[in-house]
Amino acid sequence: MGTEARAGRRQLLVFTSVVLSSLALGRGAVYTSEPDVRVPEDKPAKLSCSYSGFSNPRVEWKFAHGDITSLVCYKNKITASYADRVTFSHSGITFHSVTRKDTGTYTCMVSDDGGNTYGEVSVQLTVLVPPSKPTVHIPSSATIGSRAVLTCSEKDGSPPSEYYWFKDGVRMPLEPKGNRAFSNSSYSLNEKTGELVFDPVSAWDTGEYTCEAQNGYGMPMRSEAVRMEAAELNVGGIVAAVLVTLILLGFLILGIWFAYRRGYFDRTKKGTSSKKVIYSQPAARSEGEFRQTSSFLV
């Protein structure tokens, strides 16, 4: 209880200092009683915004999340895209039922009609959604000495989930060298992205791997277990493949040489250069006239 009381006193001091400094500078004061709001999905949410020092205040609310920006309230009225689920009051805006898409930063902007006085404050809304079952990509085999990447992700958790890896049911530490059970392995683990990288892969890395997603809300979710085998490079198989390729190439060269010795290529050449003879019938000729009309074309 003492901690809550101290936090309340700090909040009151901040509010008082904001109001006094704004009045001293001749500006309006805009503040919120709860700058960080966390609400489960499908529940109502109140975003507070209070102000003072405005003769005729005009209130607007803006929403921003990543590249998305939209206007929730304009000139003290909720915009059409939010009208069916948000209400406006002079103390803030209220969502009747929030969805995960409502997560983001809401800025309350207050000005007077003349535009001489202006102030704003931001409220972070986080819609709480438990994580779903994560999807993993784990190679079934990895060559010892190479680099292997295992990934884990899920799309529903809000706030975003953190990811923890397990090998044969034992949670993998961030620093393998500091743990006796994992000191023979060399890997890096990113709990934010869910990526597990072995570099290089060792024989000890053979085992069943699972990934767990958790975000502090709802139950943690685990993936299916997938086994990864760490194996030596199959040098014998590579050598055998090279030998088979060389033998086949040798048979091909021998076949071409045999066909050449048998004269198959010469016969083909002679067949394509054989002569053609065309005979034409002699035309009728008049008496006393002799003309050669038969011709041979070679």
UniProtKB/Swiss-Prot annotation:
Pfam families: Ig_3, V-set. GO terms for biological process: cell adhesion; establishment of endothelial intestinal barrier; intestinal absorption; regulation of membrane permeability. Coiled coil: none annotated. Seems to play a role in epithelial tight junction formation. Appears early in primordial forms of cell junctions and recruits PARD3. The association of the PARD6-PARD3 complex may prevent the interaction of PARD3 with JAM1, thereby preventing tight junction assembly. Plays a role in regulating monocyte transmigration involved in integrity of epithelial barrier. Ligand for integrin alpha-L/beta-2 involved in memory T-cell and neutrophil transmigration. Involved in platelet activation. (Microbial infection) Acts as a functional receptor for murine norovirus. It is found in: Cell junction, Tight junction; Cell membrane. The modification Phosphoserine is found at S280, S286. Residues 1-28 form the signal peptide. Disulfide bonds join C49-C108, C152-C211. The gene is F11R. Interacts with the ninth PDZ domain of MPDZ. Interacts with the first PDZ domain of PARD3. The association between PARD3 and PARD6B probably disrupts this interaction. Interacts with ITGAL (via I-domain). Interacts with CD151. (Microbial infection) Interacts with calicivirus capsid protein. Glycans are attached at N184. GO terms for molecular function: virus receptor activity. Residues 29-237 are extracellular. This is Junctional adhesion molecule A. It is a single-pass type I membrane protein. Residues 29-126, 134-227 form the Ig-like V-type domain. The Ig-like V-type 2 domain is necessary and sufficient for interaction with integrin alpha-L/beta-2. Belongs to the immunoglobulin superfamily. Changing S97A: 50% loss of FCV capsid binding. Residues 259-298 are cytoplasmic. SUPFAM superfamilies: Immunoglobulin (SSF48726). The lineage of its organism: Eukaryota, Metazoa, Chordata, Craniata, Vertebrata.
